[in-house]
């Protein structure tokens, strides 16, 4: 009987240890087509996208943890994930051109997913965005968005919920940027 308890205890400890150290990948980004339709209707000019900063994968914004489980970007860093999403959206509305005179520079200042709540998880993203045309600054602004999603005290529910919520955090940020009249004016023809 003692041996059985010892084996059960060891198995439980191993299961807890294994899930706490698991590495999860953020799901692929999916565009908000309503936001893209509105952006397309505003008739933006062509835009080049600079490398989103910080590129260092050891920077805090590129390292997310969901109750000890590392959330990794399929792009290598969350800055690259954001950059890829931005380029994909601009291509979708036929506004991306890597040699355009209008250029977007972005820096992620805050990037967090929290699954610590009992029933609700949260996401926070803050991005510094600069738009220049022919080396003249047209926009410099910091955007911040907050998201919430259903979660649970139980890690088996909360961790996958946090993982699934990351693309929505990026989508919410890009929606906020695309709907800003100052951004629309800065990238306009």
Locations of the language-model features?
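Surface-exposed short loop/turn segments
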Residues: 22-34, 92-140, 144-160
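Extracytoplasmic/secreted envelope proteins and their assembly/folding machinery
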Residues: 79, 83, 87-90, 167-174
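Short alpha-helical linear motifs
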Residues: 54-56, 125-130, 165-169
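A structural "domain/chain start" motif
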Residues: 21-80, 84, 182-189
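Sec-exported extracytoplasmic/periplasmic mature domains
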Residues: 87, 91-95, 113, 174-182
